[in-house]
Swiss-Prot record:
Belongs to the MRL1/IGF2R family. Disulfide bonds join C44-C87, C147-C183, C163-C195. GO terms for biological process: late endosome to vacuole transport; protein transport; vacuolar transport. The keyword Coiled coil does not apply. It comes from the Eukaryota. This is Putative mannose 6-phosphate receptor-like protein C530.09c. Residues 228-249 are cytoplasmic. It is a multi-pass membrane protein. Its main location: Golgi. The chain crosses the membrane at residues 207-227, 250-270. The keyword Signal applies. Glycans are attached at N64, N81, N93, N96, N143.
Length: 296
């Protein structure tokens, strides 16, 4: 019987472990368990195709909850400033503007400039995947407003990212470099987020591994014991629980301890209250005596 119970528990444990491994994508390494990673690059981040270095630009995103709003870029001799966001549509309120140039979707504009206060031109739809061209980390925004004097060519933007670790400069500096025929715009973005970093390791720490094994062992014990009690011993109800008598005795023991502690606390509280009242009476008596001495 004991051998049969052990075999059932082992089979249940192996089955549960394989289910955990498939569900969470766990792989066994020398350092422990590691979560299997997808082949796709993370959002707004990438690895260098040659060096394998990891670059994460997600820290530059300005979403609807950001108090800073879109990035404002000085246009210098272009005559107007630009508003740009990264890996997210612009968060500026565009309802007061007239979007020119037959833009397909105003909700996905990634950058724009305005003319005469109310005419808005999109310089590209929001892009979400940076990429490398040689050693240059860039992001390209396409499908903006129609270019001047064109019925099919649309405005686009090219952003070149440069690593900037200088602690004495602004954490993010965007510079307008120039444009081609008021149709293609070029910006340089200096930021520490463009520097290679280390991707967060997805290896489970020893505590997580220990807790995972404990959970699998407990489930294997419970499932295997339940099957054994029901199939072999024909148990029903609560007696299907493995080692039901042991758990019942343990629960009764814990209940007795709780009742004893509760009764002990209740027996201590009245004496403490009585002592506090006695101390208060003594204080009142001393105060009355001092007042009488002062009056005499």
């Amino acid at each position: 019987m004991r051998l049969l119970t052990c075999l059932i528990n082992v089979l249940a444990g192996l089955t549960l472990f394989s289910q955990f491994q498939r569900a969470f994508g766990l792989t066994i390494t020398r350092r422990g368990f590691k979560v299997q990673e997808s082949d796709e690059e993370p959002f707004c981040a990438l690895h260098h195709p040659n060096t394998g270095e990891y670059f994460d630009l997600s820290g530059l995103i300005r979403d609807n909850t950001s108090e800073k709003g879109d990035y404002s870029v000085n246009g210098y001799d272009f005559g107007t400033n630009f508003s740009i966001n990264l890996c997210h549509p612009v968060v500026s309120n565009l309802t007061n503007y007239t979007v020119e140039g037959d833009v397909s979707s105003e909700d996905s504009i990634g950058g724009f400039f305005t003319v005469e206060d109310d005419d808005l031109y999109s310089i590209g739809q929001a892009a979400y995947k940076p990429y490398f061209r040689g050693k240059k980390l860039i992001m390209q925004l396409d499908n903006g407003s129609l270019c001047p004097k064109s019925n099919h060519i649309r405005m686009s933007t090219l952003i070149s990212f440069t690593c900037n670790r200088d602690p004495y400069t602004a954490p993010s500096v965007i510079t307008y470099v120039g444009n081609l025929n008021d149709c293609a715009f070029f910006f340089e973005w200096k930021t520490i987020h463009a520097c290679p970093t280390v991707k967060k390791d997805s290896t489970l720490n020893p505590v997580s591994v220990f807790l995972l094994f404990c959970a699998i062992a407990f489930l294997a014990y419970f499932v295997g014991g339940f099957v054994y009690q029901r199939v072999v011993l024909n148990a029903r109800g609560l007696r299907q629980i493995p080692n039901y008598e042991m758990w019942r005795s343990l629960f009764g023991f814990i209940s007795d301890i709780v009742i004893i502690l509760y009764s002990s606390i209740l027996s201590i509280l009245p004496s403490s209250i009585t002592r506090m009242r006695g101390n208060r009476r003594n204080i009142d008596y001393v105060e009355d005596a001092l007042i009488d001495d002062i009056d005499t």
